[in-house]
């Protein structure tokens, strides 16, 4: 695995740990953060897979855009499109006043993240 891919994976795992920690917190859980870091984990794993395959990607938080690039090398991942659409909303939307995630929404985000993470890690032989 390329060193830059390893860096993406390390950062993705940091986001995954934060997403899980926030949803499990008994005192002052930050469900918005859990949703955000679930999205960030998946974004970084997608970028890791693209990086490993030498596929250029721009600066985007849109998981569907990254998926479209990845389909060239991972065509079965199209089945993840709905999960990615659902997670993309958390890149920005819940970080500002107006929307707030509850525990149920955070659980859904972490569940989707865990599913996509498992598939991409398998693809990266992790």
Give residue spans per PLM region:
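Terminal alpha-helical segments
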Residues: 1-126
């Amino acid at each position: 695995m390329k060193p830059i891919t390893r860096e993406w994976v390390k950062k993705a795992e940091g986001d995954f740990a934060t997403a899980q920690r926030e949803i499990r917190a008994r005192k002052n859980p930050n469900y918005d953060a859990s949703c955000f870091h679930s999205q960030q984990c998946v974004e970084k794993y997608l970028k890791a897979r693209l990086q490993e395959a030498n596929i250029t990607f721009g600066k985007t938080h849109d998981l569907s855009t990254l998926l479209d690039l990845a389909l060239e090398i991972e065509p079965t991942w199209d089945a993840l499109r709905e999960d990615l659409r659902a997670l993309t909303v958390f890149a920005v939307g819940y970080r500002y006043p107006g929307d707030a995630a509850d525990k149920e929404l955070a659980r859904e985000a972490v569940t989707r993240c865990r599913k996509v993470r498992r598939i991409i890690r398998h693809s990266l032989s992790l």
